[in-house]
């Protein structure tokens, strides 16, 4: 249970810059594209990427979650304590420039807001990624619910510790003294974060295969189905660096109160993003992607889980040749995205 003397709202605004940069690797882009089943040629060959005007292999939309997870480790392991776990609820990607192989990302992390809903703490973390040119290329907002001992049994943590890979920390064990020291240091040495947003995605001529003139409000995207096996979940866990065993271990999933192993929320979002960019024909034409998770996708051991994606045009802006999409994702007939939207630019 959260320590009554420890007020997480006092940490709002806590921020730091990760000491080292994250370099987007050519083969890592391909690994991640395979993990989210994204076959767009720009993720796989330099020739296809160059034909769209990119300098290297283009990373899939949700690829940025990998450096974000690395960057947020300090926040959740050494700064925010008292929770037994976290449940992801919302994710927003602001895409100012597509990531390409060779990019060096400098990460700024901030605890943006803390809200209480139905007695639970909802924490929103902001990740700002600056490239080697000093421009902000991606901003990501992640909202999680802090889970206490009332939500997660104590034996769950012990069971997880027995099955996760050596050297992986799932929950924090920092003391309040360490928190105070870390908090003070971060405020005293706050980095000069980049303020210039890259205008690449807003000024570049999109190379979409669909044109603005061919669309109307209410237009429905061709539906897409995705198939997930336990092997897909294990692969995504390794590629993304998400060690949570509820995504691959039956016993831990059941002990955590789940009916079975479930797919990573970020994996389902990655599949959804690929659904959008495959239809567009240009990964860089997606400028904002927002998802609220409302349910989980179960993946049984004996059979694959099937996900269904559909979408429609919510609005069109003829002056900017942009559109807003509403995306629906279902698993076993249940909606797993409560609300999902995408801002796109069109040729």
Tell what function each PLM region has.
Residues 1-90, 154-288:
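Hot-dog-fold acyl-thioester-processing enzymes
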Residues 289-296:
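Small/polar glycine-rich anion-binding or flexible loop at a beta-alpha turn
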Residues 1-9, 88-90, 95-217, 299-347:
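HotDog/MaoC-like acyl-thioester-processing domains
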Residues 22, 142-144, 225-228, 291, ...:
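Generic detection of short hydrophobic beta-strand segments and adjacent strand-loop junctions
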